[in-house]
């Protein structure tokens, strides 16, 4: 563990990394702003043996957002048609102006693209309204970065999604897990569970990532 994560201050540049959220329609001279469906997916592997591992950092952020739903926390439920677990949150439960779908896939990380694309098709979600939360080796534990498009940084889950979307840009929310110690292979490191101390930093990072997503959506 390199350092203790702290709450980061909102960056003025963060909201600009995402596409505008509202659809604009004109009706007899009136400008009408219509809400959309925002899809937020936390990447990870299925099964209790992977629940606390570093590769599942994205799922922790989805759980943080589930806890923020009003008037009571939301829960994921199996959505067989898309091989995912989802929570549908009507306008006002999490987002003021938009319907939100929080999700995690029931497929393994390397084949995340199929379920994510299926969710987008089912809920008619555009790539600019997709937020994928993932673990990031190249960020220190506790750091959070939101970006639109860009490379996959060797992350197989992102590669799968990018391929399924035909290379169209979408929002990526990186949660830092740090580099493996010594000569440990990254593939082994990401499947190791967080230590008790790291879990404290992860909880703070999950809250920071949730804040960043909500700021970007606006």
Could you describe each region identified by the protein language model?
Residues 145-151, 190-194:
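Short glycine-enriched, charge-decorated loop/helix-capping segments at active-site entrances
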Residues 154, 158:
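Short glycine/serine/threonine-rich phosphate/pyrophosphate-binding segments
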Residues 31-149, 159-174, 180-185, 200-218:
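Nucleotide and nucleotide-moiety/phosphate-recognizing core
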Residues 8-25:
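Short, often N-terminal, low-complexity regions
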Residues 20, 24, 29-32, 36:
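An N-terminal low-complexity intrinsically disordered segment enriched in acidic/polar residues
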């Amino acid at each position: 563990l390199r350092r203790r994560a702290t709450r980061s201050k909102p960056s003025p540049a963060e909201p600009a990394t995402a596409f505008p959220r509202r659809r604009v329609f004109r009706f007899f001279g009136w400008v009408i702003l219509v809400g959309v469906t925002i899809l937020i997916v936390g990447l990870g592997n299925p099964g209790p043996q992977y629940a606390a591992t570093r590769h599942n950092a994205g799922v922790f952020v989805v759980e943080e957002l589930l806890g923020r739903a009003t008037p009571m926390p939301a829960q994921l439920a199996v959505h067989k048609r898309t091989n995912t677990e989802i929570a549908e949150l009507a306008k006002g439960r999490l987002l003021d102006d938009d319907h939100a779908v929080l999700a995690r896939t029931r497929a393994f990380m390397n084949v995340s693209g199929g379920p994510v694309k299926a969710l987008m098709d089912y809920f008619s979600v555009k790539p600019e309204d997709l937020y994928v939360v993932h673990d990031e080796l190249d960020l220190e534990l506790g750091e959070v970065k939101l970006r639109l498009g860009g490379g996959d940084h060797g992350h197989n889950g992102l590669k799968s999604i990018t391929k399924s979307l035909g290379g169209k840009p979408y929002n990526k929310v990186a949660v830092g897990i740090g580099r493996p110690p010594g000569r440990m292979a990254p593939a082994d490191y990401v499947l190791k569970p967080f230590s008790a101390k790291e879990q404290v930093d992860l909880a703070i990072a999950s809250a920071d990532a949730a804040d960043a997503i909500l700021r970007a959506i606006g």
